[in-house]
């Protein structure tokens, strides 16, 4: 990977698309173990190459069944608790509009075009939330400014 020079970062879109060959009767357990192994190997590769590896992964459907604002949590990572254990940082991208929620029930803030980056895990620092603006017509994220609607 470094033949043309040092990589700045590696993006994998996404973990659950990596083909895993297993028998039908061992599918769930083997898939979980295989995805966990891939997550661990990805982390080792990041350390060896001294680059950040951004590994995208799907969430399970529990987040859709949750009441309220449907905020994802670490246990929502699909098919692999190992992702949660291995990752240095886990960030969820969240938009209330996806769940047909257009106003914050507590603050009454207009959530149309607003998204959140939920820093759910940060091995070397604090966790928290950062807001952003989302323009679906341009598939564009920008800094959040409360004066812009």
Residue ranges and their predicted role:
Residues 11-12, 51-58:
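Structural recognition of the conserved hydrophobic beta-strand(s) that form the central parallel beta-sheet
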Residues 15, 58-59, 95-96:
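Short, ordered loop/turn segments at secondary-structure junctions
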Residues 34-39:
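…and closely analogous acidic/polar surface helices at protein-protein or active-site interfaces
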Residues 10-18:
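Short acidic, glycine-rich surface-loop motifs adjacent to enzyme active sites
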Residues 17-20, 61:
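Residues immediately C-terminal
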Residues 1-10, 24-26, 40-49, 62-149:
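C-terminal regions of RecA-like/P-loop NTPase motor modules
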